[in-house]
A protein has these predicted regions:
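Acidic-leaning, charged glycine-interspersed low-complexity segments
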Residues: 28-36, 48, 110-165
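Polar low-complexity intrinsically disordered regions enriched in Ser/Thr and small residues
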Residues: 50, 69-72, 101-104, 142-144
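Small/polar-rich, solvent-exposed N-terminal microdomains that initiate assembly or binding
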Residues: 1-78
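Oligomerization/assembly interface segments of phage tail-like spikes and tubes
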Residues: 80-97, 153-167
Length: 167
């Protein structure tokens, strides 16, 4: 695959890339601040994320003219803020049916689920840092929801969808 180098692209064209870099960095730093361990695989991407191992992924869904939550309700002038819809997903291994065909105990299932509850709550604490991009800066607000997917392939994925302004 020939990956195109963007180092010479006009800086104005890098706003979305820089946002994705920043959201990933802020997420990692925030989880570290709360002493919540993260998988070593950490990245951002465009579109849906394949879940094939433990990982932290930031994925781009869309960008639009207008404030967070004000998507296409009225025609917008070109000078208004842009908002991006992103998903921050954290996939972790969970107890599954063993090679002997025996299901994990309820205690093991609950113990394996505890980190997903922590992940969902830390995501909701993180939103302040995504709204206030710079320290002591007042943001335009965010829209955020956190949810947990069905167990799939031995993984549980906690995802926060966030709509935020592009700084």
């Amino acid at each position: 695959v020939n990956i195109i180098d963007v180092s010479t692209v006009n800086p104005d064209a890098l706003s979305l890339k820089n946002l994705l870099d920043g959201v990933l960095d802020k997420t990692v730093s925030f989880f570290e601040e709360y002493n919540v361990p993260l998988p070593s695989r950490q990245f951002w991407t465009m579109g849906n994320v394949a879940i094939d191992c433990a990982q932290l992924a930031v994925s781009f869904t869309q960008v639009y003219l207008g404030l967070p939550g004000d998507q296409a309700s009225q025609p917008q002038r070109c000078s208004v803020p842009r908002s991006a819809v992103l998903k921050i997903s954290l996939s972790r291994e969970i107890p599954v049916v063993g090679a002997n065909g025996k299901a994990p105990t309820g205690d093991r299932i609950q113990a394996g689920s505890e980190i997903a509850a922590v992940d969902a709550w830390v995501f909701m604490l993180l939103i302040k840092h995504l709204d206030q991009w710079e320290p002591d800066e007042f943001g335009l607000g965010v829209i955020a929801t956190a949810e947990v997917s069905d167990f799939e392939g031995g993984f549980v994925t906690t995802t926060m969808q966030v709509t935020m302004s592009v700084p």
